[in-house]
Regions:
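Short Pro-Cys-Gly-centered "Cys-loop" motif that presents a nucleophilic cysteine in a tight turn
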Residues: 1-56, 65-238
Length: 238
């Protein structure tokens, strides 16, 4: 069976997941820092705007906007190749690190962008690595609330619209992050990303289909609402 091309809709954000294959993908602070350096370099070369990120031992997630159709693939391939080679050399390992290729999907920004950003920033809490997002070093949460500047992050217009000043935006994001997430919408996001089908309203999908590089949903489900199962039953990524 021919593999479908990766989704691409011009100027639309994507949620991206890389899942670990066996064992933790990061063993020390140097690993985390090197992965971020690889990400920053690859994003610059591939014209990939990074809006949110999290690195966890078993998986990583990103919220990005590609500048062109191959931006995500180019960046992910460059990051994985460069990081895995160095990780294996540093720790005396060999072989693959990630479970297949990356998973990604286009999301409707007005409805899902800020949700996806919060899901990413709170993934360490949801995975019981920490009790609060602000205490986890390896995510974009502290950037979004003004405690740190991640120079490779490009703030999305929807984040910028949270306030007229950096302080207002940071406080507004902090207030949003304090609200409980809609678990149904979280499952929608995770399931859509893992399966590679666009996430958005019917109107958005109809609009996006005009410029997308492939069909946006399975043929059998095009006229039906997708059945949503809890993504946590299928993956440890939350």
């Amino acid at each position: 069976m021919t593999r479908l091309a990766r989704h691409y809709v011009p100027e639309q954000p994507q949620h991206v997941i890389l899942q670990g294959l066996t064992g933790p993908a990061f063993l020390d602070e140097g690993d985390y820092l090197y992965f971020l350096a690889c990400l920053a370099d690859a994003a610059r070369v591939a014209d990939l705007a990074v809006h949110a990120w999290v690195l966890m031992p078993e998986a990583v997630q990103f919220l990005v906007t590609p500048g062109y159709e191959s931006s995500v693939a180019m960046a992910m391939q460059a990051v994985c190749r460069r990081y895995v080679e160095t990780f294996n050399r540093r720790h005396g390992r060999r072989g693959a690190m990630w479970r297949g290729g990356y998973r990604a999907t286009v999301i409707e920004p007005d409805r899902y962008f800020l949700l996806a950003s919060q899901v990413i920033d709170h993934a360490p809490v949801r995975n019981r690595l920490v009790s609060e997002a602000g205490s986890y070093q390896w995510s974009s949460y502290t950037h979004h609330v003004g405690r740190r500047v991640d120079s490779f992050i490009k703030d999305h217009p929807l984040y910028a619209a949270l306030g007229s000043t950096p302080l207002e935006r940071q406080q507004a994001y902090c207030n949003l992050a304090a609200q409980p997430l809609d678990e149904g919408e979280v499952d929608n996001l995770m399931q859509s990303t893992l399966k590679g089908w666009v996430l958005g309203s019917a109107a958005y999908c109809e609009w996006a289909a005009q410029t997308a590089n492939r069909r946006l949903m399975p043929l059998l489900l095009r006229d039906k609402p997708p059945k949503v199962r809890a993504a946590r039953e299928l993956t440890n990524v939350e």
